[in-house]
Amino acid sequence: MSTIFNDTVEAAAENPDLEQPYAELGLKDDEYARIKEILGRRPTDAELTVYSVMWSEHCSYKSSKVHLRYFGETTTPEMAEKILAGIGENAGVVDIGDGNAVTFRVESHNHPSFVEPHQGAATGIGGIVRDIMAMGARPIAVMDQLRFGAMDNPDTQRVLPGVVSGISHYGNCLGLPNIGGETVFDDSYAGNPLVNALAVGTLKVDDLKLAFASGAGNKVMLFGSRTGLDGIGGVSVLGSASFEEGEERKLPAVQVGDPFAEKVLIECCLELYQAGVVVGIQDLGGGGLACATSELAAAGDGGMRVNLDAVPLRAEKMSAAEILASESQERMCAVVTPENVEKFKQICAKWDVTVAEIGEVTDEKDRYLVVHNGQTVIDAPASTIDEGPVYNRPVERPANQDEIQTLGGLERPDTAEGIRDAWFKLVSSPALCSRAFITEQYDRYVRGNTVQAKDANAGVLRIDEETNRGVAISADASGRYTRLDPRTGARLALAEAYRNVVSTGARPVAVTNCLNFGSPENAGVMWQFKEAVHGLADGAKEMGIPVSGGNVSFYNQTGDEPILPTPVVGVLGVLDDVEKTIGNRLPAGEQELYLLGETLDEFGGSIWQQVSGAGLSGLPPQIDLANEQRLADLLVPAADLVGAAHDLSEGGLGQTLAELAIHAGRGLDVDLTQVHEDLFTALFSESASRIVVATTRGDELVARAQELGVPVTRLGVTNDSGVITVRGGDLSVEVSVEELHDAWSNTLPEAFGHAVGANSVVE
């Protein structure tokens, strides 16, 4: 980043024609012209930096705003009734009753994780955790959604071990359980992996904190780690279409995290909240101090004056632009009344957290002033910095969309031997094999409140030890489905996350999302994006659960080739008593197995299509969200009817039966004749709205399912044979559970065994 160390507002007025490197900072010609129009002069170096940061896609949502508004338009008053903080805040906050609230959010750290996988992923965890802290909450868990290229791709071999070690190191050091996630391999993510991190926290309803600067004379306090040169340009460079290193210094655009500093910062924040000394608070993440202070000012009822000379630094002779744009981690910014400043400092000192008074709220509405070396380097309207431009970019259905929606030829084995071979091919594939190699590097049970995590439908946490109240969380996405039909793909992601939560017996209450797409300058990508947003928003409305917040990540592409459009959807559910959680492990003794839902011939975008080498074509499975709600109506009030439940998604019934048998080490004897007339279709179709349940009260289950209009089919029984026997029509297929387990569990260690992370317990 090119900087002029003493470029002041006065100097900018005196030197109006100075050439400035705005394009290197991600600004377009018309944006630079607009900034000069707003200021009535050329911007100072610091102003140019702040506008470039705040007008980046990451901070301003300038290409997505026009479409994201649809979430608000489709949210009814009834849906929003329990939302305490929603879209536009650091994280969504949901009132779950008894004076308790839960906050959750998912965010991307894609581009930094490609450049420096360990630190990129680690600071992704740190950043999303601070978003939770900024709502007044205690973080209690994290999850991740990961996408990589093919296993044997050199980039995947480099990036995956670093990403996993970064997530495990930061999360484990924080003492936060990692309660679930997804890892997907597809060629489209080679050169552009996706690292989406989700965090969840708890708070009392009355303890909610928001990001605004209110009350003239109130002080602006910066606390946490010192400000250095790491992360400069993170949102304006790494979050844009190109990566440019600075001319004078090759500043690192990837942040460096210290989880132990963040762990202390969490406790410090919680004590500050408890002491009642915080008026407003904002974390320092993407955009650093520039983003935090300008957002606080824009959201408040006055203006703000910031003194950069008071900012604690860990590098000498940093310019104003560098101080403002630094994305050094583990920092927070708070607004505090003058009488509480001393108490604020005392609490920070108790936790050995560096703190400085760096400014104050003024009575000059919307005026954002920044001083460095005693001179004014920024004098601008805060609202123009915060709001940014709004683009209604061209939207056009791709010319090849009809072609890709035509299902190509697909191999369909019709012999027992062929089906058996296909089954092994699927369970051992990169798409469906065991993720233990990754997940065993995460601590899933630290803090002692994890009820369900390993191989679970959804992560389940106890949040109140007195009442046993808890939450279930799942995050899901399918880029393959979304490429075939973006609207349906987003609805399927919502449906799967919803179904995973329901499978634990929890009642879904809110949705979050992270929308990962290619370049917004590509009309086809913007069509995908708009369709996905509408599919997700309409789906949430149909289900009556609000979208509480989200994140957008654009420019995910290699050259001109975008990734598969990947809308990650997270669903939060509430359990009145976690002791009644439905697990997904088969209990001991004979259990009857039932399939809830209907199986159709649906292989468009399926894993079998991918594994068999048939490419990507056809239409994704049909989805009627009313069917998902009927499943919820069946399972949530009557969790005691079933001993275990496992949703069906990728790999279909065959994958679910395999996982049930593998996890329990038990045999199954099932007849799929009533599921579908074709055994291969019965096993591997990926029809939505299906769950397998185990029960000893089959008659009651069937009666209740029929009463609610849920299709129900008896599959068979569990046993201790160590064999899965599947019949359908004239065919009978037998597979050894031990052999399935070996095929399922060896794929990842064989591909990445040379790069086991430092925190791994895998042998």
UniProtKB/Swiss-Prot annotation:
Checking Pfam families in the record gives: AIRS, AIRS_C, FGAR-AT_linker
State where the protein is found: Cytoplasm
Binding-site list for ATP: Y61, R105, N513, G550
Q: Which GO terms describe its cellular component?
A: cytoplasm
Q: What is its main location?
A: cytoplasm
Q: Per its UniProt record, what CDD domains does this chain match? A: PurL_repeat1, PurL_repeat2
| Top enzyme class | ligase
Q: Which residues form the active site?
A: H58, H109
Q: Which Gene3D superfamilies match?
A: PurM-like C-terminal domain (3.90.650.10), PurM-like, N-terminal domain (3.30.1330.10)
Under PANTHER family, the record lists: PHOSPHORIBOSYLFORMYLGLYCINAMIDINE SYNTHASE SUBUNIT PURL
Q: List the HAMAP family.
A: PurL_2
What are the GO BP annotations of this UniProt entry?
Answer: 'de novo' IMP biosynthetic process
Where do the annotations place Mg(2+) 2 binding? Answer: D131, D283
- E.C. designation(s): 6.3.5.3
State how it assembles.
Monomer. Part of the FGAM synthase complex composed of 1 PurL, 1 PurQ and 2 PurS subunits.
* Name by which UniProt lists this protein: Phosphoribosylformylglycinamidine synthase subunit PurL
**Which chemical reaction does it catalyze?**
N(2)-formyl-N(1)-(5-phospho-beta-D-ribosyl)glycinamide + L-glutamine + ATP + H2O = 2-formamido-N(1)-(5-O-phospho-beta-D-ribosyl)acetamidine + L-glutamate + ADP + phosphate + H(+)
Q: What's one GO MF term for it?
A: magnesium ion binding
Protein source organism? Corynebacterium efficiens (strain DSM 44549 / YS-314 / AJ 12310 / JCM 11189 / NBRC 100395)
Query: What does this chain do?
Result: Part of the phosphoribosylformylglycinamidine synthase complex involved in the purines biosynthetic pathway. Catalyzes the ATP-dependent conversion of formylglycinamide ribonucleotide (FGAR) and glutamine to yield formylglycinamidine ribonucleotide (FGAM) and glutamate. The FGAM synthase complex is composed of three subunits. PurQ produces an ammonia molecule by converting glutamine to glutamate. PurL transfers the ammonia molecule to FGAR to form FGAM in an ATP-dependent manner.
Please give the InterPro entries that the UniProt record associates with this protein. PRibForGlyAmidine_synth_PurL, PurL_linker, PurM-like_C_dom, PurM-like_C_sf, PurM-like_N, PurM-like_N_sf
Q: Where does Mg(2+) 1 bind?
A: E107, N551
Quick one: which residues bind substrate? S108, H109, N110, H111, R130, Q255, E327, S328, Q329, S553
